[in-house]
């Protein structure tokens, strides 16, 4: 599973700045689910090929009342969710009682944590370490989050304590063996296609899982996938292997009630990252709400293939159904590539059709195409609709190749690629999607400029070549002097 790292500390010690730098965003709110994650922000981050989920929390002072008290509780909950904690302190302000209170809480919870002395601009790092040594958190790692100083050392120390997932280890092995660093994922012998069932509480996720497993379900084992109780359920259907990742847990038949489910953002985000295909469940009677858009946005950021299931469709009036379909077109335009199914998980209506869309989305996400095929599609697209002119010169796109999968990454080489407008990129994306008949998966397009491979390189001359060059230059100067004298 993708590790979870939480940023905790007093107010104004630089947690949000650190969050923005590690997630490489300005607002850094990737999974800000209002009402469910009050004062906790979730970001999808990576460092030197290692992926992780980052949680930004509100400040803790120890004397909160009212709303501040609730926000502090959310920060302490983030500590419980995390695999590792970055405890930030302000090197300029020095150690405070609030810092000591947080350190004591981390010790009581026996939480893996590292002390980070932020804002060391113009401060001796050794002095900063000595200042916070009485807290008993080990040597503080000095950083300047706003400038990026010390971040490399910090992340190396943190990620060295966290386990790698199988895909990262396989990719590292490929690189070590000199293989091309492009891994095309596929279903494993054991797991098959991994499907994450996600959605807001009470939309019928667990009911759908049990319905899809069927009366005579084939379950090899049910075991917790993480300490946060995500359940991995391998099973077979029509000879195909699958694994459900159920964040709410599967309840036995007869015990499923549409009670309020405990909603864990971390479990949902981890399930998305670990899945091949996401089935996104929505409540047809409530329509599209902002929480749905936030969750879909994270699945899209993660590049996962998506199938949308609109549950509780039975019993709705024709006018209500027409309104919901109009809202889907209006608000879910950014995932218009995903199949939408109108189902009743309780009665089983339309549920069987989900498997066909899961298979199609997965195949679209992981299929490999040769460079010749992708280049031919590019040439046809350019012939039909030329790129715009830039400073009187036409943008030239030369060839394309596959750079990765799940989602498909198409790398296009050419000149002036930095000037390609977003509208033309969308045109190319739609062209590839139409010609390759892709469904259910996002496509990413990356451009490479026509760089001169010899730029900045200079041959080292031998002594003999240096002497020859010197003689030629001397001869040239003498000849030039004679021509001037004749004039």
Curated annotation (Swiss-Prot):
Signal peptide: none annotated. Residues 448-461 have a biased composition (Basic and acidic residues). Residues 467-487 have a biased composition (Basic residues). GTP 2 binds at residues 199-206, 246-250, 311-314. GTP 1 binds at residues 9-16, 56-60, 118-121. It comes from the Bacteria. Residues 3-166, 193-366 form the EngA-type G domain. The keyword Repeat applies. Associates with the 50S ribosomal subunit. This is GTPase Der. It comes from Pseudomonas putida (strain ATCC 47054 / DSM 6125 / CFBP 8728 / NCIMB 11950 / KT2440). The gene is der.
